[in-house]
Amino acid sequence: NLAVVAVFFEQGKANPALANLLENVPERDQNVAIRAPFDANALIPSDKDYYRFNGSLTTPPCSEGVRWLVIKDPQSISAEQIAQFEHVMGENNRPVQPLNARMVLTK
């Protein structure tokens, strides 16, 4: 079993918490170590309300058994920061899946 904490981003102001991470993003098919510590907690807003559901991985093999915690409050990201991620990752999202009688709980 696996737990994933997911944060939504919407285009707006640059996100300072992502700035250090993006400075160290490798080119596609290249691995690099992030030199400076990255505080992932800086991406979690003070309002920690979330949605919770059991689902699957978003990348192959798309295995079941994943507990998703999706933060309700979207964080800001600039168009330039989005472009940096897209340059390296391309389009890597999985199509939205049917709910299949899954319960989505909220806190």
What label would you give each PLM region?
Residues 1-107:
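Extracellular or lumenal secretory-pathway regions
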